[in-house]
Amino acid sequence: MDSLNSLKGRNLTMLVDFYEMTMANGYLKNGMGDTVAYFDMFFRKVPDGGGYVIMAGVEQLCEYLKGLKFTPEDIEYLRGKGFSEEFLDYLADFKFSCDVYAVPEGTPIFPGEPIVTVKGPIMQAQFVETMVLLCINHQSLIATKANRIVRAAQGRPIMEFGSRRAQGFDAAIYGARAAYIGGCAGTACAVSDIMFGVPALGTMAHSWVQLFDTELKAFCAYAREYPDNCVLLVDTYNALKSGVPNAIEAFKRELLPRGYRPKGIRFDSGDIAYLSRKARKMLDEAGFEDCTIVASNSLDEYLIRDMIGQGAKVDSFGVGERLITSSSSPVLGGVYKLCAVEKDGKICPRIKISDNVAKISTPCFKKPWRLFDRETGKAIADLVTLNNEVVDDTKPYELFDPDFTWKRKIVENYVAKPLTVQLFKDGECVYECPPLDEVKKHCAEQIDTLWDEVLRFDNPHNYYVDLSQKLWDEKQRLLAEHGKKDEQ
């Protein structure tokens, strides 16, 4: 299992977009290889038209950065691509030396704010772009989808069932991890239990029932083998005419005489709202009021919400491909942009300009903050400042919309907390990733700090990410400077 044990045992140093190599070689040849640069990762749009994203993938990013090393085979490959010997010598002696900051896993994050910041020699800070985006984009997407589904279930457990339809085995493994962060109770993916401690759950498939001469024999055999965790799949033939009655009979024959109670039955097809109501009545009349009903079958947050609204008697849900692929909105479009460079001992901001206002980047070495109401504990807004600014929460603070600056609000009686923590200092990991159960708990606690309006599935309230006055002024200065250059 070592070969799959998270990122350990796999050298993914060369998992880069090829232009990282061409740029790094070019920086070195132009005498710019040691220029200190600052990059931010951020995203512009929430998947599914939602109100928030859940940060995930930080642990895997740390593992990747700790393991950066170019092998002789890597060097030979790049030599064959025509890169300079000077560049290849640099890679042969490569040692990561950047500072890295990130929002902790399980924290809600919002468009426009820096969620990962990398500071270091331009060759290194540029080189890690692909894996920064890959680690964070994928797991944050799945954690967010899982959290939406969990909230739709209104306290009923959600099990992640999507491994077989994930887009590759890494997507299955890390998707199960991310789904657990988002609030799922467990996974069908056994290797994620081995690697991360995500509880592995599962009982039977239709093939179990089909293999036996009769459905009743199949149920009785399973009940004998797993009396303390007996969940029977009842829709192989006819759920209400044979499946549920045979399950009840198997419970009576195999479990009750041995002092066990049934764990549940599962539906994987049909009109589950209708079937579950009928099955609940049948189970209750047979004395199995404590027998749970599990539903699966291409579910998502909208179907689960509708089923509950229609009176479905379902106690837990198994959710597969629509979770593990986030099929309704399958991409978190995180980007990685240069925001500053050091020159003559000073940090000089850089900006990316576009005709599309939404794609104009925010310059400077920055720090994101979250402002909480002292009385309610609810998040008021996020604030992005220059890195050396301190938000004094003993004083009123004027927030303003960075695009529509006449929209202003003075906040008082609030607590300001920095959003990011330092992961690496001078290339050494200084952050201890918390256990996954703690990350999951942190996620649930932080979601509770968001107003219900932000959590709506449809047309959620726009949670504000504002800029400090100093940062906004610097952005406007750069825009004006570039505007003058264009006129010349």
Model-based region annotation:
Residues 38-40, 97, 158, 335, ...:
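A residue-level signal for beta-strand positions that form part of recognition/binding surfaces
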Residues 2-36, 45-47, 82, 88-100, ...:
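Buried, small/hydrophobic-residue-enriched core segments of structured protein domains
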Residues 33, 37-92:
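N-terminal, Lys/Arg-enriched amphipathic/low-complexity engagement segments
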Residues 201, 265, 293, 315-317:
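Hydrophobic residues within beta-strands of alpha/beta enzymes
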Residues 2-35, 48-50, 284-286, 299-488:
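Gly/Ser/Thr/Ala-enriched C-terminal appendages of enzymes
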Residues 80-88, 168, 395-403:
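Short, positively charged
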Residues 76-77, 144-148, 162, 455-462:
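Short coil/turn segments at secondary-structure boundaries
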